Amino acid sequence: MTCEDGGTDADTWYELHLRTQQRLGLPPFPARFFRTLLEALVPRGAARLLIAKSGGAPLAATILLNHRNDVIYGYAASTAEGQRRGAGDLVLFSALQSAIAGGRQTFDMGSDAPAQEGLLFFKKRWFAVQKPIPTYTLGADSAGVSDSSSPRYRLLRKGFEHMPRPMLRLAGEATKYFG
């Protein structure tokens, strides 16, 4: 298994993203969001795509966001096989090596929610320290609304989990809008 720079390969990234979101039972972001992000930020050094492959087949990838001395582990995706084989660990290890070599001072593992046990386990294996992110609302508290792991979304998540991938792609286009 190898890890390589993916440049602006939004198509490879998006296929992995679709597989991950389906496994999690979540709608994907629109493809144009990632295409725009990669095409705008990678050439400026403000983002980087890393892809783990085995025999030429992509197994996992991450999009890193760079700002000054900070790196944010912004988005991660994998195939089920990549998850079993630790491809996400290889990508994260490569990202950490790159951050250190680039003189970055902070590596932010990104946001999560208390109910995202698998994600929290993955991050804790890498000695990540969880810190609360302040949120502000006007009116009623929306903490439970913003957590996609909340039991209130269980039925909806099952629907996304069993949706054929072409329909999942369309659902992402319909449910999340990015100009």
Task: Provide a role label for each language-model segment.
Residues 1-84:
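A conserved beta-strand-loop-helix scaffold within acyl/acetyltransferase catalytic domains
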Residues 104-105, 109-179:
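Active-site/acyl-donor-binding loops of N-acyltransferases
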Residues 83-97:
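Conserved acetyl-CoA-binding loop-helix of GNAT-fold acetyltransferases
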Residues 13, 87-91, 104:
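Short amphipathic alpha-helical coupling segments at ligand-binding clamshell hinges
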